[in-house]
Amino acid sequence: MLKQQFHENLEVQHVNLLPRRAFYIPYQQGEADYHFETRYNTRNATLLNGEWYFQYFESLEAYLNHSNKQESKTLTVPSVWNLYGYDQIQYLNTQYPIPFNPPYVPKDNPCGHYTRKFTIDEYDQQYDYHLNFEGVDSAFYVWINNEFIGYSQISHAISEFDISNFVKQGENNIEVLVLKYSDGTYLEDQDMFRHSGIFRDVYILKRATERVDDFKVETNLSDDLNAAQIDVKIERAHNLKSVEFQLYNPKGEEVASISGVNEHQFDVHNPHLWSTENPVLYTLYILTDQEVITQKVGIREVAIQNNQFYINGQSIKIRGTNYHDSHPETGYVMTESHFKKDLELMKQGNFNAIRTAHYPKSPLFYEMTDQYGFYVMSEADIETHGVVRLYGEDNNEDFNIIADDSKFETAIIERIEASIMPLKNYSSIVSWSLGNESGFGKNMVKGAARAKSLDNTRPIHYEGTLYRDKQQHYDLSNIDMISRMYPSPEEIEETYLSNPDLDKPFILCEYAHAMGNSPGDLHAYQTLVEQYDSFIGGFVWEWCDHAIQTGMKDGNPIFRYGGDFGEKLHDGNFCVDGIVFPNRVPHEGYYEFKQEHRPLNLVSQEDFKIVLRNQLDFIPAEKYMFVEATVTNLNGGKTISEIPLSNFLPHTAQTIDLSDYINIQHISDVILRYKLKYDDIFRHENFELGHDQIVYQRRTLKEQNEQSDETEILVTQTDKLIKVSVGKSETYVFNKDNASLESVLKHNHIVISQNTTNNIWRAPTDNDTNIKNDWAYSGYKDITTRVHDYQIVENETEVSLIFNIAMVNDAVPPVLFGTVTWHVQRNGTLNVTYDLERDMKAPYLPRFGLGLTLPKAFEQVKYYGKGPFSSYQDKGVANYLDDFGTTVTDNGEIHIRPQETGSHNETTFVEISDGCKKVIVTSDNTFSFNTTHYSLKQLTETTHKDALEPEDQTYLYIDYAQSGIGSNSCGPELNEAYRLNNRHIEFSFNLKFV
């Protein structure tokens, strides 16, 4: 049946494919209007989604030698067969899954044979029948009624075949052979799970023989934006005798209508302009005698001028995210509801832009981004990252092997064409990207030129120019921006933004790698974006964690990542790197991005005079939002008032005197909350868009002491222990060997029964991946405290136990050395004071502080510090200072791969309680704290969230500080300013047991 094989021939990308065209589904005259929610509700479309008979073969040879093509098992289309028990589930980042031997692929090439029946009720020779596949990975052959129809590859491209001469009235049979690997595999080495199958819609279009095949829509604006032109051109037609164009405005009113020409220019006066802030759409109808093509049109103009990115004459910033097609239960298959949920979260998170990493999405997605309002960088299905792994790790000298090899020219240009031609009429697409991580060379030069020839109204992006051979001259004139991924803020400013010779805008196509507890350096990037006009923004890596849901445990999904499926090659949990979980529950990092992208922000403040800036591009602030001011006084009381806005134009700042609107007497702080004025499709009225806080004076806690300052203190000793009794109700036992507080007895109840610990270890975050081995080698993980000597000092108010200590581990010198002093006061308060020096030859510390182990019943938590999310030196812009309440169980977020989470810095008060007894921590200086039911050992060694088991203890950590989070899982090293790298540590706080 397979007479010719094309999947190992770089010159053959497809066989019998119809010329690529703009995407549309033609309706018949008299049918209801086309809308993406009901896109197949036309007699012109026969949807072939559903159950197909399916047979899996481990190799093409097995398929060819198997005469009995069984029709017993079925597989849903669209789907990926890997999630239905066939083949291997595999996650890879950069490595090729097959030997690098282009154009050849392994003989053991898994394949799936699909077949089903379909019916044509009224076959009419006056019509043509076109078979469409919107996405098949990676290559496929197709037959109708046992006749070969054609072949195609490019997984994320639309393939359309003319089957008019092969179908008949009544029942027909379709067969599709899908190959896992083809020569296209060398161009599809994206960072993702490697699935296979028919993963997007399949349908047949009934086409009138007199028809429009392809058309192009472009919009242009006058300089004053008071007039627009919509240019419509029929680029290819079939037997076309006449055509009518009709244009309707967003209210459904006809603007104009014209007949009889193949192109037309609509003049629109006082146009409604499309942007992410106001995604209004006109409707264009292209009518022939038997068909109606509907195209939504957003009137907008894209330009690059003065190293800036302009939409409708306004310089805008890209506040974007990279967005793979990934779902924990369906893999590559993304439905309308999946897209809508993601776009809803993006809108709620103040994102305005999406990069379709790293391939075009289905047309449905672009129809939705047109309607809901996003700036889209649409990317070609090209990635050859595996070439840097051919001769060792990250050998970038080999990055250009494919990009500069003429054998791949046809394939690369074909992929660029396939990414532009079907999608050219979507208004939300504001730039094209030639691909991802594929180096640079003559093929990319030609690809960029081809892209410009297809569409010169949108800028072209490609990051790979960075890796070009600097000894050769390449034409970069068709690449319209300078793009980088994961440079440090310092490198960006020094190399690009402060360079007077910069001749193109600068963009980050990937940054702030959001893996695990992250990102920790977002604010530094955003500061530069706002500071420099030429820094037009970026796309966070990435939107969602990639993981496979394999079941449920205790009502929570079980997620699995690379290496969990017995793969020979894999890249572990590197796929778990999004700002939302696989099931779209937002990570804390999501709220960091939301806050950084807030539409109104505080840019300066002097006493009660503040300066706010409207970050919106087109809407006056007062029409979009209002400001709610929450004032907290020094006693903890709160009042709420509204601060009026007026004539607050986009990209302008206004000075407001808070004292005109709030009570400033005895003020502690004020939080300015920016709230939406009205309901929109994804957000409700009063939805909080972001906030700013001004702290004038922190509140202090007035401690209530159970003991009198005159209470007697009694000290007794054994060989190992020092016992300090305060009156008859409190007893503290200290260990002479390690300077720990070994137990606390309060009113004959044991509060602490395990030694406190001096901690410098944290369960490594994903961003600690490049430093954690240095930490472990230096003995940080299992560090212990060694007491050299001690002394007991008594005075009228307290007894002080002064321990001279060193923090040590086998085979390494002491990391820290100095004194820890326990001051036992007559009122029952313990004061803990550290005065330590650090070995500066050792790596910077993960953390430093005291750990307490309490009974599990200590569950309720109150604190005065930064919340409600985790906060670290460089992560926590979504937080604010306030009184917060939570539980130990709910503190922080447990990541798919467990790691450090749940710390709260800038704290001065913590209370943890079992409902009766309390442990209270206070300090005049801020500290960090964390509390959990999982030990550091368990969090460090457990590889999956569902394997964690809550322990019968509550762990409370009081930290001088932790090192920052950063984004070094893929980005720059942690900024030195956020490393716990002190030579000297002085730390003091109070412990009280009530």
Swiss-Prot record:
Top EC group: hydrolase
Family: Belongs to the glycosyl hydrolase 2 family.
Keywords, in A-Z order: Glycosidase, Hydrolase
Superkingdom of origin organism: Bacteria
Residue pairs linked by disulfide bridges in the UniProt entry: none
GO molecular function terms listed in the Swiss-Prot or TrEMBL record: beta-galactosidase activity; carbohydrate binding
PANTHER family for the chain: BETA-GALACTOSIDASE
Cellular component per GO, a single term: beta-galactosidase complex
Pfam name, any one: Glyco_hydro_2_C
SMART domains recorded: Bgal_small_N (SM01038)
Reaction catalysed by this enzyme: Hydrolysis of terminal non-reducing beta-D-galactose residues in beta-D-galactosides
GO terms (BP aspect): lactose catabolic process
Alphabetized InterPro entries for the sequence: B-gal_small/dom_5, Bact_Beta-galactosidase, Beta-gal/glucu_dom_sf, Gal_mutarotase_sf_dom, Galactose-bd-like_sf, GH-type_carb-bd, Glyco_hydro_2, Glyco_hydro_2_AS
Name listed for the protein in its UniProt record: Beta-galactosidase
Record: active site: 437, 510
Keyword match Cell wall biogenesis/degradation: no
EC number(s) stated in the UniProt entry for this protein: 3.2.1.23
